[in-house]
């Protein structure tokens, strides 16, 4: 896994947690994006990277789909 080039931003509070949960489940970012797209979220790699890096706001639909893919609750994304 590559290390993050930039520090985390402050546009959201879930990005770091999403990244940690995704890597814990050993899901590559590109595979995760594909799963999101399959579930109806129109997202590209740059936009997703910004979400994990906390440099953009996550939508409610994105949070719902992310929690579903990670088999967790939306609440856990905020912890």
Model region roles, listed by residue range:
Residues 18, 29, 45, 60-63:
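Helix-turn-helix DNA-binding elements, focusing on the entry/boundary residues of the two helices
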Residues 1-25:
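A short, Lys/Arg-rich alpha-helix, primarily the initiator
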Residues 53:
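Short, conserved catalytic or interaction motifs in soluble domains
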Residues 17, 47-50, 76:
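Residue-level recognition of specific faces of alpha-helices
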Residues 59-76:
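DNA major-groove recognition helix of helix-turn-helix/homeodomain DNA-binding modules
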Residues 27-50:
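Short alpha-helical DNA-recognition segment
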Residues 22, 33, 37, 67:
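The alpha-helix within a helix-turn-helix
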